[in-house]
């Protein structure tokens, strides 16, 4: 490879159906926050299912040493059947490990210098399979969710006659001739700010023609939650329901991804997964990809939010006014494991302050009020009326030093917080 620069009636859900914000561009920097740490959540790749893991990572380390990419760059090469779909799910955090929620991510598809000749499609945006560096073949921009997650369905559209031979294993070298004319691969790089400012991951897939149909028995499948990654720092466990519970801003999209493995522990491709919402009052459907991952994007449209929790691990409200309980299942099977998850939706504010020259900036984060108009008042600053377009929107307010009371009014209800600028 060359150098390459609830209530159920009002819970709406979509399966990978959020419209992209922009498509097709060159390699211009995305311009988001610097030092974003971007990791691949699905498919999960490591030395057991990638080609020449050690040498490829050494290559990536060399690109970092040259200053082309930010530190921590990961480069992995794997395989997928020609004509298959791969659900690429990424998690984005800042350098301190805090999720970068509702942040623009540019998926650079068959990026410049990738030498990729595959025809792939994301959100209806299709590559031409012609590498013309420094230009990417396609770009799709989406927003991360409240947990910093984002997912893209990468569909390969090449003919079987164009595919590479199936490798002996996923740790083998891709099989193609020295002139590379029969090589068929795609290559993706998610970007938040720029190549040097991000700490990202480049993933390359070689498309092969299977020697035989891929069939994985799954009479007792294991269906595990991959995204969001919930633990003791961002969720609580309801032992009675045997599921994890987490808070999310009202009105925001959530990426929910499951991994399905069969009776022998292998990934189950092309299997429909039903996601039962609130006891089966509604059902969402998604099909597992080439690596056994089913990806859902769930959109909340409740109108009566819960109060903001004191922390992400606060007990869930006894009588929640906005929630969604999600449980996966596969028709005709009895799951050995089926991990459910429950989200409780809230509205509230938080404030932080930072030095800006001789003055300070109070950042007022308003959660769960997309589509609303908020009155924002901070001690010593002029009151502002702000139209909110995101489920988590930050309003910057310039102030002088001193103690500040932040008051936000939405639909006649006041939300307050206090900070000290010093």
Question: Could you describe each region identified by the protein language model?
Answer:
Residues 11-20:
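Bacterial N-terminal signal peptides
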Residues 19-422:
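The feature marks long extracellular or luminal low-complexity segments
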């Amino acid at each position: 490879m060359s150098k390459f620069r609830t209530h159920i009636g009002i819970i709406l859900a979509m399966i990978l159906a959020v419209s992209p914000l922009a498509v097709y561009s060159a390699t211009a920097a995305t311009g988001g926050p610097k030092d974003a740490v971007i990791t691949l959540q699905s498919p999960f790749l490591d030395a057991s299912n990638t080609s020449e893991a050690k040498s490829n990572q050494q290559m990536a380390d060399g690109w970092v040493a040259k200053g082309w990419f930010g530190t921590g760059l990961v480069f992995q090469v794997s395989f997928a059947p020609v004509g298959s779909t791969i659900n690429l799910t990424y998690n984005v955090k800042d350098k301190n490990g805090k999720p970068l929620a509702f942040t623009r991510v540019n998926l650079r598809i068959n990026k410049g210098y990738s030498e990729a000749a595959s025809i792939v499609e994301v959100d209806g945006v299709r590559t031409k399979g012609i590498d013309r560096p420094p230009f990417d073949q396609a770009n799709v921009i989406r927003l991360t969710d409240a947990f910093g997650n984002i997912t893209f369905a990468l569909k390969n559209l090449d003919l079987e006659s164009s595919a590479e031979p199936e490798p002996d294993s996923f740790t083998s070298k891709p099989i193609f001739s020295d002139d590379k004319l029969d090589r068929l691969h795609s290559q993706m790089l998610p970007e938040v700010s720029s190549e040097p400012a991000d700490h990202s991951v480049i993933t390359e897939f070689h498309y092969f023609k299977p020697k035989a149909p891929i069939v994985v028995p799954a009479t007792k499948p294991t269906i595990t939650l991959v995204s969001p990654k919930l633990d003791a720092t961002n969720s609580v466990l309801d032992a009675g329901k045997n599921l994890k519970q987490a808070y999310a801003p009202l009105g925001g999209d959530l990426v929910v991804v499951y991994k399905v493995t069969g009776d022998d522990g292998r990934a189950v491709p092309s299997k429909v997964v039903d996601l039962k919402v609130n006891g089966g009052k509604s059902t969402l459907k998604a099909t597992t990809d080439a690596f056994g991952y089913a990806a859902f994007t769930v959109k909340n449209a409740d109108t009566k939010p819960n109060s903001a929790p004191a922390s992400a691990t606060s007990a869930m409200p006894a009588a929640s006014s906005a929630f969604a309980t999600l449980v996966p299942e596969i028709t005709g099977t009895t799951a050995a494991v089926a991990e459910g998850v429950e989200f409780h939706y809230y509205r509230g504010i938080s404030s932080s302050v930072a030095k800006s020259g001789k003055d300070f900036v109070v950042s007022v984060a308003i959660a769960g009020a997309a589509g609303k108009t908020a009155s924002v008042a901070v001690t010593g600053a002029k009151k502002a009326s702000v139209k909110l377009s995101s489920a988590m929107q930050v309003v910057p307010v310039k102030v002088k030093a001193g103690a500040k009371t932040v008051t936000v009014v939405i639909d006649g209800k006041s939300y307050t917080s206090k900070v000290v600028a010093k």
